[in-house]
Regions:
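Bacterial Sec-dependent N-terminal signal peptides
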Residues: 1-32
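Beta-strand-rich domains and repeat architectures in extracellular enzymes and scaffolds
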Residues: 39-64
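Entry beta-strands of beta-propeller and related beta-repeat scaffolds
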Residues: 56-58, 99-101, 143-147, 199-201, ...
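Blade-level signature of beta-propeller repeat domains, shared across WD40, Kelch, NHL, RCC1
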Residues: 333-353
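Recurrent small/Gly-Pro-centered beta-turn motifs in extracellular repeat architectures
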Residues: 61, 103-105, 147-150, 197, ...
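Asp-box/BNR beta-propeller loop motif
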Residues: 27-40, 63-83, 108-128, 158-177, ...
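Short glycine-/Asp-/Thr-/Trp-enriched loop segments that recur within the blades
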Residues: 41-42, 84-88, 129-134, 177-187, ...
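Repeated scaffold domains used in trafficking and secretory/extracellular systems
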Residues: 46-49, 88-94, 131-138, 234-239, ...
């Protein structure tokens, strides 16, 4: 969503926070017993899109940058993708076994493939429209992938590939559910799309906060309402994750009132058919990214957002503060005990015990 770009810089300036230093240890009662934070690198950079590729953490960033950090070699590789005089911002990233894909926000929308071996960059999709703004991208398998963007007409902009990312096709509006006026998506952490097998969930915000579901890899869709706060441009679902095909969690809130802790978290036990609020007045306010902890039986969740890093071990009802650093936008797990978080000016490793 375009307005999120403007609010991000303002939000960082206005928020007051205490940063946890490297190797800070946080103890909490059960579940995990401690967490330490290792800074992998710092730079003048904004990162909202990361993925784990074996020993590498790939990222898309602002100022036309992408790269990776090699966890084994402790080295960073970074490159720019120059397109005329444009300063691209990559907020969507996805991968196949051979390539990493980067998708820019705003107009024009530019989607690039990057060969993992030789780092060769190729433009595979371009869309020009004053309203174009892509928010998230994922792959079902090595051949099929999907990206979601704000409506340019009266439905989400959805592009798919069936040939490993070589070509992308935009789904016609008459094949998609109609969006409400003012309903779009947020490019907060590349978590607007969640895939489990063939099941696909898309989440929306703004005037409506809904979940769009496809059981057949974007061929047909159903839509359900959620109780998440909605009605204003910067309210709704900013992030989602599913532990399996049945258990999911959505979060977000009101970006302009980041301390609001009600109607901002919900869970499902039936694959997204119904959603129930949880954790009212508990834990965080605005959420940028939520992720289930691997091996946590759908009960353990990590959130990064307006109040730092928080952890729940009971499905989102109660939350423990792990860090008050509000500069993280996105997080991904490597395994149960290790995650990578990125955001404003840094990428770190979170170590849980």
């Amino acid at each position: 969503m375009k307005k999120l770009v403007l609010f991000c810089s303002i939000f960082i300036l206005l928020m007051s926070f205490r940063t946890f230093n490297d190797k800070t240890k946080v103890n909490f009662s059960s579940g995990f017993t401690s967490m330490t934070i290792d800074t992998l690198f710092k730079d003048k950079i904004s990162i909202r899109a990361i993925l784990i590729d074996k020993n590498k953490v790939w990222y898309g960033a602002d100022n036309s940058r992408f790269g990776y950090y090699d966890l084994d070699k402790k080295e960073k590789f970074e490159e720019h993708i120059y397109r005329d005089t444009l300063k691209l911002e990559f907020r969507s990233i996805a991968q196949t076994s051979k390539n990493v894909f980067l998708l820019s926000v705003a107009n024009p929308a530019l989607l690039y493939s990057v060969d993992k071996k030789d780092k060769k960059v190729k433009l595979v999709y371009k869309e020009i429209n004053p309203k174009v703004f892509y928010d998230s991208m994922q792959f079902w398998n090595d051949k099929e992938g999907i990206a979601i963007g704000d409506p340019t007409e009266d439905t989400f902009s959805i592009i798919v590939t069936r040939d490993g990312g070589e070509t992308w096709t935009k789904i016609l509006s008459d094949k998609l559910p109609t969006n409400a006026v003012g309903e779009a998506a947020f490019a907060a952490s590349n978590t607007n799309i969640v895939i489990k097998g063939n099941d696909t969930w898309l989440v929306s915000g703004g005037k409506k906060a809904r979940v769009f579901y496809s059981a057949d890899k974007a061929k047909t869709w159903k839509v359900v309402e959620t109780p998440i706060v909605q009605g204003k441009a910067m309210t709704g679902i900013f992030t989602a994750d599913f532990y399996d095909s049945k258990h999911g969690f959505i979060a977000g809130g009101d970006y302009e009132i980041p301390s609001r802790k009600v109607d901002n978290k919900a869970f499902t036990k039936d694959g997204g058919k119904t959603w129930e609020l949880i954790g009212q007045n508990m834990g965080f306010g605005y959420a940028s990214c939520v992720q289930y902890v691997p091996g946590g039986n759908g009960k353990e969740i990590i959130c990064v957002g307006s109040e730092g890093i928080q952890y729940s071990q009971n499905g989102g009802e109660n939350w423990t503060q792990l860090s008050t650093d509000t500069k993280f936008f996105t997080v991904r797990f490597i395994n149960r005990n290790t995650a990578i978080a990125a955001g404003h000016n840094k990428v770190v490793r979170l170590n849980f015990k």
